[in-house]
Amino acid sequence: FNKTVLARTEFYASELNNARFNSIKLTDVKFTASDLRKTIFEHCEFNGVCFKSCDMKGISFDGQVFVDVKFDNADLANSSFRGVILRNVSFRPTFALTNKYYKSIKTIDFDGASMDKLTYAALKGVGVSLENIVLL
């Protein structure tokens, strides 16, 4: 996918290994139970996107924009959000907060990210290290 717009699109149980999303505007897109570990996102804008029960270990979202995005039960261990803009973004675990979830979310790198106060408070509340963050 290169320099396109994806609107109201759904990826269900998809294995998107080596798929490349370059300069894409994703609006109201749903990724459900998908393997995104080797998916590449570059220069994308995420608006109203939902990542539900996706395997996203080690993925890099560096320098991208997220507005009204939900990460519902998504495994983001060792992923990178360096220099991103986060507005009204939620990171929701399964119905129970487990030690595995706390350990996993603490491995996410938010260095240099800009985020609204609500997103900041939610991440800080689960113990994420938020140094070098800019509040919007």
Predicted regions and their residues:
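Tandem repeat scaffolds
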Residues: F1-L136
